[in-house]
Every structure is written in structure tokens, then in C-alpha cells.
Amino acid sequence: MSKKFWSNIFLALGVFLAFAGVATISVSADSSATIESNTSSKIIDGATYEENIRGVIPITLTQYLHKAQTGEKFIVFVGFKECVHCRKFSPVMKQYLQQSQHPIYYLDYGNNGSFSMASQKQITDFYSTFATPMSFMGTPTVALLDNGKVVSMTAGDDTTLSDLQQITADYNNQ
């Protein structure tokens, strides 16, 4: 056998062993790590969420739509207890409720909330109140409605007290 044949065999074997060694390297991450955020890394349970939002006025989807259709000006918090983002946001809502000059209505978006028994038309009508330029972006959402449309809104668990105070300012200036 030729020298070239053996050098090709050794080269192929070397490449194979190099890649085989790379393939057996495993990487793992600590699945219990907590990711810090700009609000809080504390996990908030459902009972604490309910305590944090004490002071909101629960309304049904029918009541919400009636307020919107009659042109009433109001602030609504759309959320639900099982929503991780809503629970994370709830301490900010608690602060806001302590200083709010206006009633804050609460529309339960969860599986057992107002939407669970709503007709398709009611659900469509709800989403139409968030028409251009603002669309419903999920929960938690705090919105100011006037004349049947959202005129000011904030959404997400990174909503700050300042964001909510801006909604109050918009309410006062409408």
C-alpha cells in the first residue's frame, strides 16, 4: 500500500475524531436562574395579584361595551390572575390605585372571565374599540376610552407608574 493511501486514512481518522470530540461536548444551563427585570424579580402569586388590584371595579364585557357605545370616558385595566405578566405588573397597579383620581374598571380577560361567555360579536366589538392607531396588544393593558375608542394606552409588564399617570393626565385633558 502506498504512503499516500495511509496518510489519507490517518487524515480522515483525525478529522473524524476531531468532529466526534466536538459532538460529545454538552452544555447545560441552570434552569432555576431568575432573570432580573426593571420592575421586580419576585414571583407574584394569584392571591397577591388580587390583593394588589383591590380597588378596581370589575365589569363584564357587556358593561364595557355599553360604556364604549354610549361614549363614556373611562379607564379600563384588562388582565387576568393566571397571566404572569399581569401579576408582575400588579404592584405598579397597586401604587396607581392608591393615587388615582378616577375609577379604574377591570375587565377579566382570563378563561373564566368575561370573555368565556361572550359572543363572537361581543369579542369583535371589544377589539374594534382598539382600532387605529392603537391595537390590543395583550395583557396587561390599561387604556383610556373616550367616545367609544381608545385614546391613550399602555401595555405590558414593563408599564411604569409614570405611564399610568400619563393616562390620568390624558383623561383630565380630554
From Swiss-Prot:
This is Pediocin PA-1 biosynthesis protein PedC. It comes from Pediococcus acidilactici. NCBIfam families: PedC_BrcD. One of its GO terms (biological process) is bacteriocin biosynthetic process. SUPFAM superfamilies: Thioredoxin-like. It comes from the Bacteria. Probably involved in pediocin PA-1 biosynthesis. The keyword Repeat does not apply. The lineage of its organism: Bacteria, Bacillati, Bacillota, Bacilli, Lactobacillales. The gene is pedC. The keyword Ligase does not apply. Keywords: Antibiotic biosynthesis, Bacteriocin biosynthesis, Plasmid.
